[in-house]
Amino acid sequence: MSRPIDRTLETRLIEAATEWFAAFGFAGTRMEEVGRRAGVTKGGVYFRFRSKEALFFAVVDHWRDALRGAVAAGAGMGGTGADELEGALRGWLGFHAEHPDAGRILRVLAAELRAGFTAELRDDAQAEHRAFRARLRECLHRGGRDGSLDCGDPALTAFLLAGAAEGCVSQWLAAPAEAGAFRSPEALAEALVTPYRTGFQRDLAGADDPGAAFTPPL
């Protein structure tokens, strides 16, 4: 009698491998430990994934798909271009706040594999940055068309916003205790987008100018 198919094996291996790759990097991860964590032998891991590299890229693909889905869901909440921009940033930051190991996995790809492997990388570490910036540019262009955003150069603004969001995540990972007070995706996304909302600079100038409400005598 043939052995029943374990339909949860790949999910368990992805989860176990995520923990190991995030904690120990590519070189430090041992397939037998991944298997033990997932409840199978080392041979069981290789039965599903032909190599450690194949397992690693399965992990990368899993988290990339999840991240892009989170950004798309955030941007797809409706409203103006400004609302979509804030939603996209909120989705991206929220994903990394909920899944810190995913960010570490992408850093392993950038730090170890791009320099050390000659095998074709189906999508290099820069691809995720490009996809994120492209999504932000779409929102910025829409905000310019519907009048909800005033950013000047959408490409430059997307680059700055993506860099700011990435910087937030880097600080979360490097100094979680110190950055703990600044882990709200909602607050961060709002703070990043507000300066580009139409009328913000005018409102800010009016609030800061002590003579704004002064009416000169006739």
Predicted features, each with a name:
Residues 65-68, 117-146, 155-159, 187:
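Amphipathic alpha-helical packing segments from all-alpha helical-bundle domains
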Residues 91-95, 130-145, 164-218:
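C-terminal peripheral helix-coil segments that are non-catalytic and often amphipathic
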Residues 97-122, 170-174:
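Amphipathic alpha-helical segments used for helix-helix packing
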